[in-house]
Amino acid sequence: MLAQTRLEKEDALAQYLKEITSSKPLPRERETELAERIQAGDEAARQELAEANLLFVVSVAKQYQNRGLTLAELISAGNLGLMIAVDRFDGQLGNKFISYAVWWIRQAIMKALAEDGRLV
């Protein structure tokens, strides 16, 4: 029973990774445009900016493996940080979104590790 649950989780993670591999980073101009639309409450812009950066969250999450949480849990925490960054990003400051978002992604992962991770 436990092995089956683990396999289902691994299959779900594999499917998720397969789905997001086609996402491409956005040009800075597009990020700025989306940030303005997000500030105006455009949910589609919020989704587009987030989806374009899901693969980056996975790459950051992989750096924190073997610290007490599964890769899926790390990705989930990183995605929460990504959404905070999406909501707070100001494209007028001239920064690339990912340079801003990486701090929120790492912070969310570190918080999850502190709260839920276990010492090895």
Positions of the model-derived regions?
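Alpha-helical promoter-recognition and RNA polymerase-docking modules of transcription initiation factors
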Residues: 2-120
